[in-house]
Amino acid sequence: MKKILAAPQPLICTPPTVLVGTMVDGKPNFMAVAWCGVACSNPPMVSVAIRLARYTLKGIQNREFSVNIPSADIVKETDYCGMVSGAEVDKVAACKFDVFYGQLTNAPLIEQCPVNLACKVAHILNLGTHQLIIGQVIETHVTESCLTDGKPDLNKIQPFVYGMGSTTEYYTLGKSLGKCFSVGREIGTRK
């Protein structure tokens, strides 16, 4: 297989596109974020990268935020939240989001999203064009119909990713390739 040398870029398959929520000037605001991920499993922490000029970043000053995982059926609303600024548009009203709160009053959550994480800011790293916000997950809410045997089911959640590289489109998950920590046994066992 021939390889070509490309310019340095973070060409890692992105995790799901999420809607990051903050309270800005007393009102809930959401923005679409593609650069996010799991930062730690214990304590549970997630990371989101937000451009310095984004309005949502003002709400991070409250030291609380939410990560809402939208399903494929609200891709238009999610995309809209990445196209317009909350400084100019009430995205909650425009998208008809039903907002609720858990114990963190500065971490607005979206009812229409099957998974919601309420987070407290643990660290903020200045990286260049973005700030990396590390948040400790305080609460996790999952829509009951998106569970199978009491566990979140990706086929029911229907997350989607932001396609990077030659295309900038959203993609849903495809078929299963095999069971984790099992399919590799065809090569050998764990030591």
Each language-model region and where it sits:
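Basic, polyanion-binding surface patches
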Residues: 1-191
